[in-house]
């Protein structure tokens, strides 16, 4: 019976890893309100319909990383990272000692948060490298590969959670069949240690909820003072951890005090669907980026806004290609321009974009004569007579 409970515990804790991601993506488009996280939750995207809103979050993260090492944003970011490591260690030791899958799963969740943050920081460091002779377009796709890998693992974990939860739920609902059902390396007998010391497990989870809620409030306060979007996203990560920790706490309490072991695998099944949706949508987005899909509207707005605020020059933006780390901007110039004038204009546009968007390590600007066949081809592809006219274009959010 406890084994069933343990299985769902694992599933319940898988939810936290996904919820923070959802809350972060969503805050970008919804003013960081938790209700958006719930909505995104149901859609199951960056669930990017989270689109990982991610490009905007990535731009904000790079801004924060470029600040001084003692900035409030980085201090709290590292505090959150250390708290995840501490919680993972405490829950892992407690879970093994009490033979509690819910604590072990909780520890895995905290460790998953930590690994995800480290992967993000590592890929950002790689992506920030300047283009080389071997990689003239920069290293921007490393971030996409990292996202694709982590999302793939998330999908695999969700499938494992679903299988384990359904198996234990079946055993509880049909005990006559479950009595003959065994797994290699374990049985479905309840853990006596956990039932003898339930408050130790409950205390560890409750403590993590309190810590995460405290981190949420402190981080949100600093984020509002510093007007830091990325820090506000991080705050909602902590709130999501606290809320989903409450779900695990309720599942564990119900299993023990109400003698309802089915709660754990039941919640595990629901969570596995949400986790799978998150992983699938993030993987899909990363896969499409590897296929050089058009950049998100967020990136296009960032580039056009940067150019609108820059020096007024005689050109039009034909199209924008690339990702949050490496962009390719094609512009049209007057037919009367010489090759030297076009080259100088392209250099000015490139500098304007790179200065305005710190996340970019590479920006290639290709000038084309406005009466050339290539410009007409791009205009036809974009379905317009010209994407943007820089001198007169008015952009609104």
Swiss-Prot record:
Annotated transmembrane regions: 142-162, 191-211, 242-258, 260-280
Recorded topology in the membrane: Multi-pass membrane protein
UniProt keyword Cytoplasm, yes or no: no
One Pfam family linked to the record: Cation_efflux
GO biological process, one term: iron import into the mitochondrion
Main location: membrane
Keywords: Ion transport, Membrane, Transmembrane, Transmembrane helix, Transport
Annotated localization: Membrane
GO CC, alphabetical: membrane; mitochondrial inner membrane
Family annotation (InterPro entries): Cation_efflux, Cation_efflux_TMD_sf, CDF_Transporter
One example GO MF annotation: iron ion transmembrane transporter activity
Homology family: Belongs to the cation diffusion facilitator (CDF) transporter (TC 2.A.4) family. SLC30A subfamily.
Protein name: Uncharacterized metal transporter C1020.03
The organism of origin for this protein: Schizosaccharomyces pombe (strain 972 / ATCC 24843)
